[in-house]
């Protein structure tokens, strides 16, 4: 195509002012350097420019590791029309100027940004292809943990803040290998533009602009965030301008975009076609997080009830979404009806108004005190009207149907670790990720369905966003005088009962009939006792003389 003929010439000219004629600082033939354990260090702008010079000269660094060790701030270019950086990697063409040679001048190593921030880059080449921090990345190249702020990237074809083109090669050839772009972040003061230029037969289209990557070809982008201002003529997305892919016989895509989201408010396609909040032209996107077109900046994401098999676990998701407002779904979680108590621990706060609007009809309580006396552990609960992020609660869902996969709207995500509610003799501990008990544990208790409370008598997993009780001061469940033989759960004005162990079972049953009487060893009586002694009624010890 005519556009490509012009591109092959334009690339050589456009990057002239930002190019560095520096020899390699990274000897790829040295097996002891550039490993994952001893990566090549990018310590300053000169090192980054040297990497660009090497790759653009044909050194792909396949299998070599690089790590950014410091924040980098570029000085503004002499004029707005010029550039102060040459992208790492470029796309060249065969002699016919029609066939792209994606592998020839591509980065194929591993670049770890180390969470450091690169700012001030300006690339202004409106007639060039493959523009970004990395122009061209090819399998098995990996770019991860890079942060970008206050940067501007302008090209004509395949423009992205992190990478212009990310290519996996032949469809399916590397489908079981992780490569691509991971856990990168682009700030709101970054602009990405695929500009049109030229006229007539020499006109260049202004295609494929993305806040993270311009064109994702049979490759992967995972866990990335962008708030960039993105524009182009066509194929414009907050994360990717386009995703190209193929699928295996089972229909699974070889390329994917997963757990990424766009938090900006400006994605513009001047030709009014192929523009999306996440991706402009979608060939393959996993149905996961914020992947439908809609209002830019509105986040929707899913937390997994049991994330042990997930490629991205809840901790990573929470870290990616920290301090952002979102609609959050607890996938796989069910709040049971018919007056069943459920434990819950959420990574976001809810005001009293939100609790009323989204959780009604429910009763919400949290642990107030936990005391142990003469073989009886008493857990007292107090009413709550709002939810604190990371604090465990018990909740009684009183709706007519069970509430599966509950969604909470307009909440602000917190990645801070859950906090215990502590009592003298027991704590209430919330979790965001599945917890394995590791075997029998008589110093912990957990609530199950139908208001039944257990201790684990074998290895088991408590799923995410729940809570359990841990016993303090050496207290364990058992029949000895110094052990917990009976348990009282006091729900205030609700009926309260004693919990006692059934024979030959790890199961404890919560009896909650109003005004029932119990002996201290857990035997339920048929009515108020007439014999003198100490008894339990409505969660309190009563002395009858």
Name these PLM-found stretches.
Residues 164-169, 215-217, 242-245, 348, ...:
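Short, flexible beta-strand-to-coil junctions
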């Amino acid at each position: 195509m005519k556009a490509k003929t012009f591109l092959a010439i334009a690339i050589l000219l456009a990057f002239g002012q930002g190019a560095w004629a520096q020899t390699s600082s990274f000897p790829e033939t040295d097996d002891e350097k550039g490993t994952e354990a001893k990566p090549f260090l990018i310590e300053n702008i000169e090192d980054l420019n040297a990497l660009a010079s090497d790759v653009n000269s044909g050194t792909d660094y396949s299998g070599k590791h690089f790590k950014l060790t410091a924040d980098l701030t570029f000085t503004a270019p002499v004029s707005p029309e010029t550039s102060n950086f040459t992208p790492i990697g470029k796309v060249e063409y065969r002699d016919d100027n029609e066939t792209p040679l994606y592998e020839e001048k591509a980065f194929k190593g591993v670049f770890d940004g180390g969470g450091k921030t690169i700012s001030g880059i300006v690339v202004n080449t409106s007639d060039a292809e493959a523009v970004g921090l990395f122009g061209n990345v090819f399998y098995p190249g990996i770019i991860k943990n890079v942060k970008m702020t206050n940067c501007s990237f302008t090209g004509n074809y395949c423009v992205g803040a992190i990478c212009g083109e990310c290519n996996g090669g032949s469809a399916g050839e590397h489908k079981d290998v992780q490569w691509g772009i991971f856990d990168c972040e682009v700030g709101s003061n970054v602009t990405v533009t695929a500009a049109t230029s030229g006229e007539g037969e020499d006109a260049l289209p202004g295609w494929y602009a993305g806040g993270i990557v311009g064109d994702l070809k049979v490759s992967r982008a995972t866990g990335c965030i962008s708030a960039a201002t993105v524009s182009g003529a066509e194929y414009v997305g907050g994360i990717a301008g386009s995703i190209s892919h193929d699928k295996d016989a089972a229909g699974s895509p070889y390329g994917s975009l997963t757990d990424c989201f766009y938090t900006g408010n400006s994605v513009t396609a001047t030709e009014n076609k192929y523009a999306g909040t996440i991706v402009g032209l979608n060939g393959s996107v996993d149905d996961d997080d914020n992947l439908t077109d809609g209002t830019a900046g509105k986040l929707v994401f899913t937390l997994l009830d049991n994330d042990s098999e997930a490629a991205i676990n809840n901790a990573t998701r929470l870290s990616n979404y920290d301090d952002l407002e979102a609609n959050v779904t607890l996938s796989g979680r069910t709040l049971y009806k018919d007056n069943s108590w459920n434990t819950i621990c959420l990574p976001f706060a809810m005001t009293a108004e939100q609790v009323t609007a989204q959780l009604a009809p429910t009763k919400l309580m949290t642990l107030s005190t936990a005391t142990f006396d003469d073989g009886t552990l008493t857990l007292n609960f107090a009413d709550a009207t709002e939810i604190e992020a990371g604090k465990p609660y018990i909740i009684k869902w009183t709706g007519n149907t069970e509430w599966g996969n509950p969604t909470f709207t307009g909440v602000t995500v917190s990645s801070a670790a859950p906090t215990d509610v502590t009592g003298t003799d027991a704590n209430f501990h919330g979790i965001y990720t599945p917890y394995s008990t590791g075997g029998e544990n008589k110093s912990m208790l957990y609530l199950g369905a139908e208001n039944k409370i257990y201790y684990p008598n074998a290895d088991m997993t408590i799923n995410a966003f729940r809570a359990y009780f841990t016993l303090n001061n050496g207290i364990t469940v058992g029949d000895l005088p110094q052990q917990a033989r009976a348990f009282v759960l006091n729900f205030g004005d609700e009926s309260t009962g004693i919990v006692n162990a059934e024979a030959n079972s790890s199961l404890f049953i919560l009896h909650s009939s109003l005004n029932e009487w119990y002996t201290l060893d857990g035997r339920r009586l048929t009515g108020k006792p007439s014999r003198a002694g100490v008894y339990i009624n409505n969660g309190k010890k009563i002395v009858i003389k």
